[in-house]
Amino acid sequence: LKYKSITYDPEPSTIGVKNGVSQLEFYDHFISEHKNSKKIEEYLIKSDIDFFLNNEQTAKEIDLTGLKGRLYPLANETDLIVFSPMMWGYNYIVSQNFIDSLNEVQVSDEDYTIYSVDIENAQNRNYYLLFIPIIPSNEVDYVNSILYKRLRSNASEKKYITISNFQEYNDLLDDYPFYDFTQLALPSTYKSKHILNIQNHVDLFLSDELIDSLQSKNVTNLVIKKHPKLVIQDHSL
């Protein structure tokens, strides 16, 4: 499979609001009213990434069905909705159109989990929180990845860097925290997955097949990015 990363469009012309980061809020009182409020707070909102990764299966199985949210005034309804507060593993609320594409390309049930949510002021009643397991940074194939230091300069001045392992990556970040990948590599264990969520990489990676399906349905608030390139090795590390 070949992949591209996706993001959302922060412009008011698409999401309706000017904050650029969120169309909807799961307000504190909505969370506190939910039957699993304590687990939501403990595992998804207030935890750090290490706690989450160590308890990811438990976090994934927290039933969020019926969690109430509210669109901000002027926010548009789109097929991908960005929301607050941040919850580990949940990048977007998605519409039935998005779910139909997951089914169309036969994305494995092991690769995602959905829970229907109640958006009080939405016209469309079929929205879902989409959980994608996070691939830990220590599973990235750093030998075949390429990084560059993020500078206030044009692309021609980028200095590309190759490293050998996860420890070298951590050492780089300790020295200078602003590195981006121009190529990101994963081991062969991930080669059949249509949707990937990698630690320290904000955007999801989708297979070209899944992207084609989403675009055929005119899914809104979906932005396809050219970089970084994702490669999955044919052999195990």
Label every PLM stretch briefly.
Residues 123-237:
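Acidic, proline/glycine-rich low-complexity IDRs
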Residues 21-39, 74-75, 139-152:
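Short, charge-rich amphipathic segments
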Residues 1-67:
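A structured, charge-rich N-terminal accessory region that forms the first stable segment of a protein
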Residues 86-147:
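Extracellular-facing segments of soluble proteins and assemblies that are Gly/Ser/Thr-biased and enriched
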Residues 2, 7-13, 88, 135, ...:
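Short, flexible beta-strand-to-coil junctions
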Residues 80, 84, 88-92, 96-112, ...:
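Short, compact, well-ordered microdomains
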Residues 67-70, 86-91, 101-108, 170-173, ...:
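Short linear motifs at secondary-structure transitions and domain/linker junctions
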Residues 37-105:
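Short N-terminal edge-element motif at the start of the domain
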